[in-house]
C-alpha cells in the first residue's frame, strides 16, 4: 500500500480522477481544502470519487481546510478508524478530523 498526498483540490474532482499512479489498496489523502462537499444536496462529486475508489480499489481521506462547508462535514456519522475519530462520507471516503492522530 502506498499513501499519495495532495492538497487544496478546491472541489476539482477531475484532478483526483485523472491521477493514475495508484495501485490496489492505496490511499489518497487530501490535506485541506478538499471542497467536494460544498452545496447541500449536491453529492455528484462524492459519487464520482466513490465510484473511482471502487473501480481502483483505493481509499480517499481528507483533512478539512479553511474552505469547507463545516456544517455539512459535521453532519456525517462519526466512527473509529485508523486509531482516531473520522467522519464517514461513504464506504471509501473519510474525513480525518482535527486534533486526531491516525495510523494509516
Predicted regions and their residues:
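Core catalytic region of metal-dependent phosphoesterases/phosphodiesterases
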Residues: 6, 11-103
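Extreme N-terminal starter segment of soluble prokaryotic enzymes
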Residues: 1-4
Amino acid at each position: 500500500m502506498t499513501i499519495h498526498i495532495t492538497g487544496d483540490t478546491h472541489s476539482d474532482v477531475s484532478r483526483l480522477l485523472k491521477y493514475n499512479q495508484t495501485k490496489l489498496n492505496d490511499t489518497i489523502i487530501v490535506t485541506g481544502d478538499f471542497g467536494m462537499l460544498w452545496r447541500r444536496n449536491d453529492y455528484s462529486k462524492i459519487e464520482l470519487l466513490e465510484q473511482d475508489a471502487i473501480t481502483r480499489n483505493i481509499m480517499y481521506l481528507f483533512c478539512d481546510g479553511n474552505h469547507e462547508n463545516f456544517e455539512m462535514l459535521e453532519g456525517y456519522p462519526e466512527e473509529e478508524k485508523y486509531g482516531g475519530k473520522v467522519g464517514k462520507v461513504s464506504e471509501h471516503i473519510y474525513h480525518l478530523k482535527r486534533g486526531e492522530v491516525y495510523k494509516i
